[in-house]
């Protein structure tokens, strides 16, 4: 080893460092020069093999070279980092004189809008909004509502059961059972929320929203029921149309009825549309919640919120409400 070799190595190392174009290349040079097996490090390891009289001078020379190269590496790294930052600032610069971008405005889902509209109308009629659990037991969902264990009417409801016998409620009527058990007549209430049935097509969903109403008082009659629902339908659709009540069967009411409206279609023709079910509360239901059916009578009704949303907004396929397509939902914002 001679000093000229060290000087030549130093000159080449400094030239390579100055020519480095990126941080990765610079790190490669640092390892090649000053790393564990770098050329400068290997020179320092060879000092022990030199004659004693040469070690001090060459050792001092190598240490100065190492410090010089280290300083050059640090300076070049700072220069490359500064250049990279400047480029990034240019690439990501924002012209503050340009007009700003408006934030996306959200809006209520059409089902939520419909649900709120219905509950608001019934609130004006004096009905209290009540909520209840979506996971029910057989008593509140079926038996208390005059669905005995082997009653054929249970086949009307395609039910999701849990292993312990509980179930996802098939209607919000269970909320009425709980409310009647805790309150004494007279009372007016509506129960709103999600219900679940194993059914899915253009007009049915495994999960949908339902509102059921209940009125109990002395001398409540079917005429009161007809007047209440006729007033609600006219308030919701904001139009007058013919309403008819057809006899129908529901285990928890007697007599029961389906409610149809004379709906004017886009071609100006009129057809009857079924919109909800109703009836006078069955005496067995009152008995199951400890209310004297000889003293009190009442009526109940139920409707699908999505059905009303489809009619109000002209939607043909119920499934569109649950697909979360922003293009569809933006129409109602």
Curated annotation (Swiss-Prot):
Entries under InterPro entries matching the protein: aa-tRNA-synth_II, aa-tRNA-synth_II/BPL/LPL, Phe-tRNA-synth_IIc_asu, Phe-tRNA_ligase_II_N, Phe_tRNA_ligase_alpha1_bac, Phenylalanyl-tRNA_Synthase, tRNA-bd_arm
Free-text comment on the cofactor: Binds 2 magnesium ions per tetramer.
Record-linked HAMAP family: Phe_tRNA_synth_alpha1
One cellular component (GO) term of this entry: cytoplasm
Localization per Swiss-Prot or TrEMBL: Cytoplasm
Names of required cofactors: Mg(2+)
Subunit structure: Tetramer of two alpha and two beta subunits.
Family per record: Belongs to the class-II aminoacyl-tRNA synthetase family. Phe-tRNA synthetase alpha subunit type 1 subfamily.
Keyword Nucleotide-binding attached: yes
Gene3D superfamilies linked to this entry: Bira Bifunctional Protein, Domain 2
GO MF term list: ATP binding; magnesium ion binding; phenylalanine-tRNA ligase activity; tRNA binding
Coiled coil: none
Main EC class the enzyme belongs to: ligase
GO biological process, one term: phenylalanyl-tRNA aminoacylation
Originating species: Xylella fastidiosa (strain M12)
Name the UniProt record assigns to this protein: Phenylalanine--tRNA ligase alpha subunit
UniProt entry tagged with the keyword Ligase: yes
Main localization (coarse): cytoplasm
Reactions the enzyme catalyzes: tRNA(Phe) + L-phenylalanine + ATP = L-phenylalanyl-tRNA(Phe) + AMP + diphosphate + H(+)
EC number: 6.1.1.20
Binding-site residues for Mg(2+), renumbered to this chain: 254
UniProt KW keywords: Aminoacyl-tRNA synthetase, ATP-binding, Cytoplasm, Ligase, Magnesium, Metal-binding, Nucleotide-binding, Protein biosynthesis
């Amino acid at each position: 080893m001679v000093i000229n070799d060290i000087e030549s190595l130093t000159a080449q190392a400094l030239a390579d460092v100055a020519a480095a174009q990126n941080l990765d290349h610079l790190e490669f040079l640092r390892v090649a020069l000053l790393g564990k097996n770098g050329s400068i490090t290997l020179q320092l390891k060879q000092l022990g093999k030199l004659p004693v009289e040469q070690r001090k001078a060459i050792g001092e020379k190598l240490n100065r070279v190492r410090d010089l190269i280290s300083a050059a590496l640090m300076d070049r790294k700072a220069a490359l980092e500064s250049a990279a930052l400047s480029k990034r600032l240019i690439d990501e610069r924002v012209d503050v004189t340009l007009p700003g971008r408006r934030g996306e405005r959200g809006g209520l889902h059409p089902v939520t809008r419909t649900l709120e509209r219905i509950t608001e109308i019934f609130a004006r009629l004096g009905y209290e909004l009540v909520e209840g659990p979506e996971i029910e037991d057989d008593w509140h969902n079926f038996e208390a509502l005059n669905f005995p264990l082997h009653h054929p009417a249970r086949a009307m409801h395609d039910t999701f059961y849990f292993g312990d016998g509980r179930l996802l409620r098939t209607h919000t009527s269970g909320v009425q059972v709980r409310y009647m058990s805790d309150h004494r007549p007279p009372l007016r209430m509506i129960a709103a929320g999600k219900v679940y049935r194993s059914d899915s097509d253009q007009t049915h969903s495994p999960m949908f929203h339902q509102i059921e109403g209940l009125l109990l008082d002395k001398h409540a009659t079917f005429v009161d029921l007809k007047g209440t629902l006729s007033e609600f339908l006219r308030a919701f659709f904001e139009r007058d149309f013919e309403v008819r009540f057809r006899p129908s069967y529901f285990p928890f009411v007697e007599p029961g009825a389906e409610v149809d409206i004379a709906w004017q279609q886009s071609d100006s023709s009129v057809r009857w549309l079924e919109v909800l079910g109703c009836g006078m509360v069955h005496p067995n239901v009152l008995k199951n919640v400890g209310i004297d059916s000889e003293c009190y009578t009442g009526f109940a009704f139920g409707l699908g919120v999505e059905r009303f949303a489809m009619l109000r907004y002209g939607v043909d396929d119920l499934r569109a409400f649950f697909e979360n397509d922003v293009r569809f939902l933006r129409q109602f914002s």
